[in-house]
Amino acid sequence: FIPGTLEKWGIGPDVLMAKNGGLVIVRVSGWGQTGPYAHKPGFGSLIEGMSGFAAMTGFADREPLLPPLALADMIAGLAGYGAVLAALRARDQGFGQGQVVDLSLFEPLFSILGPMATAHAIDGSVPKRSGNWGDVAAPRNVYECSDGGYVAMSATMQSMWEKLAVAIERPELVEDPRFLTNPDRVQNRSELETIVSEFFAKRTVQENLTYFEERGITVGPICNIADLIKHPFILGRQVVKTYADPDHGALPMHAPFPKLSGTPGTVRTPAPMQGENTDEVLAEIGLTADQIATLRDKGIV
């Protein structure tokens, strides 16, 4: 909510914590509870644009790109999760009370984009859109294969680059002044990527995966969900599990992660239908069956 909304409803942190001083209250908004934008609404797309993410995503000759998912919201959720654990730990280890977590969508996303502010202060650099190449290491790209599929490869470490040069049957490139060091390869990455791309284009996805894996090169497939649902990694690690659903039968869903050795998570039930647990919740807070029935008769619940 925009800052001030809870206060307008009469349930601001001061009111809630007067009832229970141990509460940890996470306030998530686009721009945070303070600052010149605090009063503004802020959806994830705005944050993805203003944070620097879109400016550095995409190709140099095209418009900035927004992510095809709620990236800012999801990263803020992970940050909030960590903040709640820290606040609970502080409460239980001597601080003795709850606190309010002021979480904007902006700061978590801005933080994972790297030390842009520091780099800009030192040398004035501004990250540019460079597609899959990146600005600091080469070769790194997505490569089309002979069957129309794609693989991703990163051979940016010097030892990996030297293995790659041998694997693509161009060992002389290791001593080529254009590609001698990583800065050299970044400077001349257009020529380098052309050479590497031509080699990948001669083989299918599976042929490339097998060929480079045998030679210790880090290559992986570009997968969509149809590929993933039957992928041996997904199956072997149980990334997705099947759960019973009253409407759809057996449904594949993300399994809980991270995987704790002593107390692994589990999905007890599928998501409830709207209002499915209303009576149960109202009973937990002390309402009788007659009172709940009255609320239903009046259309309140």
Where are these regions (language model features)?
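Flexible, small-/acidic-enriched active-site or ligand-binding loops
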Residues: L180, A244, H248-T294
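Beta-strand segments within the central parallel beta-sheet cores of soluble alpha/beta enzyme folds
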Residues: G98-F106, Y211, A293-D297
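Aromatic-enriched alpha-helical interface/lid elements that frame and gate functional surfaces
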Residues: G134, P139-R215, V219
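Active-site-adjacent "lid/gating" segments in soluble enzymes
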Residues: T5-T156
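Residue-level signal for nonpolar/aromatic packing positions in well-ordered secondary structure
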Residues: L16, I25, G44, V84, ...
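A glycine-rich dinucleotide-binding beta-alpha-beta segment and adjacent secondary-structure elements
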Residues: E214-R268
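Alpha-helical scaffold segments in soluble metabolic enzymes
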Residues: G80-A87, K163-A167, I195, D227, ...
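Short linear loop/turn motifs
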Residues: E175-R185, C223-K230, Q291-V301
